[in-house]
Amino acid sequence: MKETTIDQTLVLCDLDSLLLDAAGNLPQLQRDVLQLFASRGGRLTVFSQRSPRAVRSLLGGVRLSAPALVCGGTLAYNFSEGSGTALCSFEGMEESVLKMLPSLSGVGIALQMRDGSTRAVRMSEGLVFHLKQE
């Protein structure tokens, strides 16, 4: 069996749960390890619940080898091109989703705008926590 080399593997890291510290920052040690991995031919990308803007801010100079999965995996965002590809859509379900969401208690509603900003339509405890981290 042929051994897989580091440059033949893409590592997908959960940014929010694995790499960030309790304060929601990317510690220098993790940043250094990611950069060392990449400098040795490792291929890396991240998954995050956060917006592309927030992920870029957290990663700083860490370069990704593939689009990041952001906004909870609903968007594949290529930072080198500054563009994203939607991985899911509510197309065709707008009426049912828009009718159902307002009646759900405790559910926050936020929209990710094309410019990367987030607009809260209805706040919840979870959404407040998430937006503070972003």
Segments predicted by a language model, with ranges:
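A general structural-boundary detector
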Residues: 4, 17-20, 42, 63
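Generic detector of low-complexity/intrinsically disordered segments
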Residues: 12-17, 113-115, 133
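Asp-based phosphoryl-transfer active-site loop
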Residues: 7-24
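Acidic, His- and aromatic-enriched active-site or binding-groove loops in soluble protein domains
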Residues: 126-134
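Active-site phosphate-binding/coordination module
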Residues: 25-127
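Flexible, charged surface loops at secondary-structure boundaries
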Residues: 3-6, 102-104
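Short loop/turn motifs at secondary-structure junctions and domain boundaries
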Residues: 2-4, 10, 59-60
